[in-house]
Swiss-Prot record:
<keyword id="KW-0346">Stress response</keyword>
<dbReference type="InterPro" id="IPR008978">
    <property type="entry name" value="HSP20-like_chaperone"/>
</dbReference>
<dbReference type="GO" id="GO:0042542">
    <property type="term" value="P:response to hydrogen peroxide"/>
</dbReference>
<feature type="domain" description="sHSP">
    <location>
        <begin position="34"/>
        <end position="152"/>
    </location>
</feature>
<dbReference type="GO" id="GO:0009651">
    <property type="term" value="P:response to salt stress"/>
</dbReference>
<dbReference type="GO" id="GO:0005737">
    <property type="term" value="C:cytoplasm"/>
</dbReference>
<comment type="similarity">
    <text>Belongs to the small heat shock protein (HSP20) family.</text>
</comment>
<comment type="subunit">
    <text>May form oligomeric structures.</text>
</comment>
<dbReference type="Pfam" id="PF00011">
    <property type="entry name" value="HSP20"/>
</dbReference>
<dbReference type="GO" id="GO:0051259">
    <property type="term" value="P:protein complex oligomerization"/>
</dbReference>
<dbReference type="GO" id="GO:0006457">
    <property type="term" value="P:protein folding"/>
</dbReference>
<dbReference type="InterPro" id="IPR002068">
    <property type="entry name" value="A-crystallin/Hsp20_dom"/>
</dbReference>
<dbReference type="GO" id="GO:0051082">
    <property type="term" value="F:unfolded protein binding"/>
</dbReference>
<protein>
    <recommendedName>
        <fullName>17.9 kDa heat shock protein 2</fullName>
    </recommendedName>
</protein>
<keyword id="KW-0963">Cytoplasm</keyword>
<dbReference type="InterPro" id="IPR031107">
    <property type="entry name" value="Small_HSP"/>
</dbReference>
Amino acid sequence: MSLVKLFDTLAFDAWNPFSIFGTTVAADAWLASDTSAFANTYIESRETAEAYVFRADLPAGVKKEEVRVEVDEGNVLVITGERSVRREEKGQRSHHIERSCATFFGRFHLPDDAVVDLVRASMDGGMLTVTVPKVVTDKQPAIAAAAPVPAVVAPAVEAKAIEASP
């Protein structure tokens, strides 16, 4: 009887000195965490009465030039970003260079009432906000016709003169 399962693929993997209990640990954790935070950017979307709003909390140090917002295929909002990190250390007997590149993107199909020509994007403190306004309509929502409400008639009140007492 073997302790290794016949089809256990992890049993046949080559030994990796940076692997601890099945998870890979980067040799230089600061570079990996910075890159993975950028690549795993979450884009939140919500709808208001006037617009569709998309927000992304980007990692510290991301520049406006690294983020791109565009409308593709008529009604698809595309938010992309690319970041490259290069680290170089020169010693007396060594020269060490590390490079890392990460990208993120989000594609959102916009409804027919989105005005794609007026898309606005702003970035403040690492928070990217993209606003897509809606078409303004002057129509009021139709109120369903209901049965007429009967008029309430108050009973007649007799007018009595109030006599002044002496």
